[in-house]
Amino acid sequence: MSSVLVRFAPSPTGRLHLGNARVAVLNWLFAHAHGGAMVLRLDDTDIARGTAEFAQAIRDDLLWLGLTWTREESQLARAARHAEAVDQLKAAGRLYACYETPEELEYRRRRQRAQGLPPIYDRAGLALSAAERAALEAEGRKPHWRFRLDHEETSWLDLARGPCHAHGGHLSDPVLVREDGSLLYTLPSVVDDIDFAISHVIRGEDHVVNTAVQIQICRALGAEPPHYAHLPLVLTAEGGGLSKRDNALSLGDLRAQGIEPAAINALLAALGTAEAPDPLKSLDELAQGFRLDAFGRAAPRLDPADLVRLSARIYHALSPSEARARGIAVSDALWLALRANLTTLSDLDELLPVVEGEITPLIAEEDRAMIDEAARLLPETPWDATTWATWTAAVKTATGRKGKGLFMPLRRALTGVDHGPELAALLPLIGRDKALARLRGEKA
């Protein structure tokens, strides 16, 4: 494959959610699977809603995921170049002025539907004479400009969907320039893809309908189009669409909840394929063997609970040295005792006091005699990983307690909770003095 250059083109009108983060991840993986690179293109022409803060948040979120780009571009800063493309298309006779109001266009569409016809623009603007255009402008009307599609078959090999085609005669000539002179998304996107030498455009299948139009615009500007791949859109677990308004699935909120970026990358890379997500793989490892044709045609559903589960797998596999590198200031033995019980790192706030702080023991009245006997039988130090089994065997013999009736009261007395890390590993870390005090019902 020739040199691969992809682009991720978010609009800085909100935080990244998992849907557009997936586009970024898949573009990066595809590029790096083929020795290529990614361009970050901010589609920042929506001045009313776009902010510099959102743009920076997008950069921060991408870097948090580990995604890199070789260059960053702003569409707004390229307005002069886009205007040149408008002039080029006008000069070639591919842009023509139209003067209908939105109400007039809607009326025509209703009539077409009532007649059983597709609501396709009838090219009335193309038939206007210079005198008719002048008369309309004298009324105060300003033109919007449509791209004249060739009424022919446009075909492309979609790298995710296979062979695709659309006939220009079945499509409305798209508006590229509004009445106020501002450009719709379509033309700047094509111009930027040409100028940046983008080789592959990987995006959601909601853009499939635009592809034939963009290919024709690209060729009208004297360039060959990039390769395209359109993937099914991700749905929520309930079957709804993802949105910037769904804050629970924004990268910023997921980060605040303690979700690991590697968990997000793994899930987004596997979503829609037959592969199980592996959060222990790096981005480079995920890129190895990455294939667009591995994705199915059905819209995958994304359950945030999967991210929690995958994040937990990362913590469970984290070595003491890796934990220290993350700034987790606990001993090796304590980390090994606690990690299997972590869902997010914030769980440490509840677990650490069991060893390093004070807890209030929970001792039910019906367990008091058994706990007193356990305190009497508590072994002398030194303690090791076998102390728990030796001690509980002695308590079992002395009290007749076994199973849950033996272990649950001891856990409540020693930790103040009903569940947690294995006490065989935890008991030596708690220490004899603190354990004895808790068995006596003292806060320690």
Curated annotation (Swiss-Prot):
One of its GO terms (molecular function) is tRNA binding. A motif ('HIGH' region) lies at residues 10-20. It catalyses: tRNA(Glu) + L-glutamate + ATP = L-glutamyl-tRNA(Glu) + AMP + diphosphate. One of its GO terms (biological process) is glutamyl-tRNA aminoacylation. Pfam families: Anticodon_2 (PF19269), tRNA-synt_1c (PF00749). Its EC number is 6.1.1.17. One of its GO terms (cellular component) is cytoplasm. It is an enzyme of class 6 (ligase). The keyword Membrane does not apply. It is found in: Cytoplasm. It comes from the Bacteria. Gene3D superfamilies: 1.10.10.350, HUPs (3.40.50.620). A motif ('KMSKS' region) lies at residues 241-245. ATP binds at K244. Keywords: Aminoacyl-tRNA synthetase, ATP-binding, Cytoplasm, Ligase, Nucleotide-binding, Protein biosynthesis. Belongs to the class-I aminoacyl-tRNA synthetase family. Glutamate--tRNA ligase type 1 subfamily. Monomer. Catalyzes the attachment of glutamate to tRNA(Glu) in a two-step reaction: glutamate is first activated by ATP to form Glu-AMP and then transferred to the acceptor end of tRNA(Glu). HAMAP family: Glu_tRNA_synth_type1. PANTHER family: GLUTAMATE--TRNA LIGASE (PTHR43311), GLUTAMATE--TRNA LIGASE, MITOCHONDRIAL-RELATED (PTHR43311:SF2). This is Glutamate--tRNA ligase 1. The lineage of its organism: Bacteria, Pseudomonadati, Pseudomonadota, Alphaproteobacteria, Rhodospirillales.
